[in-house]
Amino acid sequence: MPPVRFGPRKILEYDGRYGVLICHECRYAIQKSALQSHLLRHKIYRADRQQLVAMINELDLLEPDDVLLPPPESPPIDGLPVIAGYRCTAPGCANLCASLKRMKGHWRESHGIADASLARPAKLQTFFRGTKIRYFEVTPTTEDEDDEENESENDEEEGDVDLEEQEDDNGGRQSTTVTTSPGPSAPSVNVDLETLSYFHHFMSATSLTLPCPQDMQSGAQYWKEKAVPQALQQRWLMCGLLALAACHLAAFPDNAAAGQQHRKRAAEFSLEFRTGWRELADTSGEGLREVATEIECLLRCAHWALAESPCDQRIMPEPGVPEHLQSIISTIQSTVPAAAPHEAETSAYATRILRWNTSEAGNSVLAEIRNRLHDLPARMADTFGRPENIQDVLVLLSALAAMGECCDTSFASEEVGPAWWGMATWWTRVPLRFKELVARHYPASLVVVAHWAALMVNRTERCGCWLVKGLAMTILLRIAERLPEDDDGNVQRLVALTIAA
């Protein structure tokens, strides 16, 4: 059976010769167990995804360990990158490595030698990534070599291909880009007119839109007085600020070409920032660590906000659609100071929701929000039935009480600072048990998180925060995927898409 292309933009190809389904945008084969999440990554939602999955289930897809690899004389497989690697020439050994560094490791571990003559160059491919990577040698034609995109310089002093260290789809993190170690491949920041224009934009515009990690006030003073002086001493940190400025410009481009250029520069600045941060994270002082952590979290949010499709220029080496709800939660929570959980106060705190007086709310919007949160436990009980664990009920009530109080902060003004602070600090005030329930996809806890997204994340976007553009809908769609399906739709209706004020 010849390979067959299908799906939106014809991104999927089934190759019956090997029993694999290749994604042409991500450039690797998809495991059966990761099919649903992979299609969602490409923003293929429920109806279209179910139709695609039904069709793919009719195909004979093999598990990675069962796929027979092509012989070395075979031409490259269409849709997979060709890597300039090495083949071990030791007697009885034909091990393949993507870099000379890894080949030397193979010699030490398998042959007890360090002889660079025991290898020859080879063109390699792999169907899968992460823990299921299995290289095979191919023989490109002249035409293939002209079009070939080598993903590594294969020099011991330069960045090695790092497909082995990327997690597969089941691991939750996957990247179609190549991770490099620090070296000449990382772009440098030259002090030219373009760089100066990005810095000027950060000082005059971007800094005014960013949250402050220390309090709910405007972040402009924090970024100008605390972040910029440190960035002037650390080039990699300055790259983080320039990346945020480029992202901000990409969010509001003058035209499509300008938008793509800003995305490209954002990705380059981000790479140098992350390279420097990885090198110095363990030795940085507390102040520098706070600024760098905040930049990293905000760049991840910007990456999600700007990723219109998986093939976009990537600002961060991860999917444009967050693979897991937990990655969104941890990113948002990390933008504000951590707070020690008060587990002993859970019961007392939970009763606050029962004592709410909506007449004391600051305005009609907050009164409506408190009414809805107050009524939510009863609606969940009607839908999910009598709870088995009374302690978990108290945990949910405590989380709702904290949400009501954080909404008071978020809706106190039309400014981004209070809106972000209320949105992010909620996660520092909920019990640890609540976070455990969310991680286990406990339906009632997901309904509570859905209200956080519809109310507080949506509120932050409405206040003008470009960093969370579309994030509320992404969270709600992620949650909807995890909720049990029922005939009358009661569970889905609990994900209150319409309660945002």
UniProtKB/Swiss-Prot annotation:
Q: Which GO terms describe its biological process?
A: regulation of transcription by RNA polymerase II
The organism's taxonomy opens as: Eukaryota, Fungi, Dikarya, Ascomycota, Pezizomycotina
Q: What induces it?
A: Expression is induced by an intimate physical interaction of the fungal mycelia with the bacterium Streptomyces hygroscopicus. Expression is repressed by VeA and MvlA via histone 3 acetylation by the SAGA/ADA complex.
Matching entries from InterPro entries are given as:
OrsD, Zn2-C6_fungal_TF, Znf_C2H2_type
What PANTHER family does this protein map onto?
ORSELLINIC ACID_F9775 BIOSYNTHESIS CLUSTER PROTEIN D-RELATED, STEROL REGULATORY ELEMENT-BINDING PROTEIN ECM22
Q: What does this protein do?
A: Part of the gene cluster that mediates the biosynthesis of orsellinic acid, as well as of the cathepsin K inhibitors F9775 A and F9775 B. The non-reducing polyketide synthase orsA produces orsellinic acid by condensing acetyl-CoA with 3 malonyl-CoA units. Further modifications by the decarboxylase orsB and the tyrosinase-like protein orsC lead to the production of F9775 A and F9775 B. The functions of orsD and orsE remain unclear since only orsB and orsC are required to convert orsellinic acid into F9775 A and F9775 B.
Cystine connections: none
Which GO molecular-function terms appear in the entry? Answer: DNA-binding transcription factor activity, RNA polymerase II-specific
What spans are recorded as compositionally biased (Acidic residues)? 142-169
Q: Which organism is it from?
A: Emericella nidulans (strain FGSC A4 / ATCC 38163 / CBS 112.46 / NRRL 194 / M139) (Aspergillus nidulans)
Polar residues: bias regions: 172-183
Q: Where is this region: Disordered?
A: 137-189
Q: Which gene encodes it?
A: orsD
Protein name, as recorded: Orsellinic acid/F9775 biosynthesis cluster protein D
